[in-house]
Curated annotation (Swiss-Prot):
GO biological process, one term: double-strand break repair via homologous recombination
Functional summary from the UniProt entry: Catalytic subunit of a heterodimeric structure-specific endonuclease that resolves DNA secondary structures generated during DNA repair and recombination. Has endonuclease activity towards branched DNA substrates, introducing single-strand cuts in duplex DNA close to junctions with ss-DNA.
Region named Disordered: 261-291
UniProt keyword list: DNA damage, DNA recombination, DNA repair, Endonuclease, Hydrolase, Metal-binding, Nuclease, Nucleus, Zinc, Zinc-finger
Species, as recorded: Drosophila persimilis (Fruit fly)
Main location: nucleus
Record protein name field: Structure-specific endonuclease subunit SLX1 homolog
This protein's encoding gene: slx1
Length: 291
């Protein structure tokens, strides 16, 4: 299989959760420019499913109303539940308790396109909890649709352009992220000085490969939240040992990759359009959690 283009990012299978926006390119005026919001763990595969129809895993709402373009995707969610909650709120802004404070989201403005309306909803969502605390990436997949947000988004979020490729290959992961030397862990937490039990589950370290920071996950979270009383999920901060700037989402992603990928998910590069795994049809009802 040829390597991905230089502007194409590589995400590791089992660690990618995205919420995407489709726009119809149908020649039928009833469907052209209509939009659809969905969840995926594999963007390339998902758009193929939508364009091939229900029999190949596409959604009922998109069947025979395309062809569709996946114009943007939001990713960086810590898990599929968080992404599904985001998807549901983006689909249902009038029902989401977090978005009811924005009465202007109840309907499209006069002459506003379906894309502009969905983009306006997204802009509002990125500024409210719990999503404004997440280190999300807003990725443009089609340059024709790129535009700036009217309202500023949190500075720890990233806006990028280019496709994303999902790979189960350990070789590709190492090529994309670099092969780091084995971590020399301490047996005690550097912050509370207590022994770290069940280290595979509760231990975190620094992203600086030369730093030997070893902490309980909760201890490091509390340390990084020192200047933010009342919050539960840190955004980032300085390493208590080497003062490297840390991103909480990057720490968790690094830990997941250190735990490895299940054997059944490795080295399987063939696409199966009839089975999209954890991807969920947007007709599924998702309960919105309260703070």
């Amino acid at each position: 299989m040829p390597p991905p283009p230089e502007d194409e990012a590589i995400a590791h299978k089992g660690h990618f959760y995205g919420v995407y926006l489709l726009c119809s390119q149908s020649l039928d005026s009833r469907y052209r420019a209509k939009c659809y919001v969905g969840f995926t763990v594999n963007p390339k595969r998902r758009i193929k499913q939508h364009n091939r129809g229900c029999d190949f895993g596409g959604a009922k709402k998109t069947s025979k109303k395309g062809p569709w373009q996946m114009v943007m995707i939001v990713h960086g969610f810590p898990n599929n539940i968080s992404a599904l909650q985001f998807e549901w709120a983006w689909q249902q802004p009038t029902l989401s308790t977090r978005l009811k404070i924005f009465p202007d989201l109840k309907r499209k403005k006069p002459k506003e396109t379906h894309f502009d309306y969905n983009f306006r909803i997204l802009n509002r969502m990125l500024g409210v909890g719990p999503w404004h605390r997440l280190a999300l990436t807003i990725r443009w997949l089609e340059t024709d649709y790129e535009r700036a947000f009217d309202l500023p988004i949190p500075c720890h979020m990233e806006i990028v352009s280019g496709k994303v490729s999902i790979s189960a290959s350990q070789r590709k992961l190492e090529e994309a992220t670099g092969t780091a030397p084995p971590v020399a862990w301490a047996h005690e937490c550097h912050l509370c000085m207590q022994s770290i039990e069940q280290p595979e589950r509760s231990r975190l370290g620094c992203t600086n490969p030369t730093c030997r920071l070893t902490c309980h996950m909760l201890c490091l979270a509390s340390y990084l939240l020192g200047d933010e009383p009342g919050q539960y999920i840190p955004i980032g901060g300085e390493c208590p040992l080497c003062e490297t700037r840390l991103s909480w989402s990057a720490l968790l992603q690094r830990k997941r990759l250190q735990l490895g990928v299940p054997e059944e998910m490795q080295d399987n590069e063939e696409e199966d359009l009839s089975d999209d795994g954890p991807d969920v049809d947007s007709d599924v009802e998702v309960q919105e959690f309260s703070d």
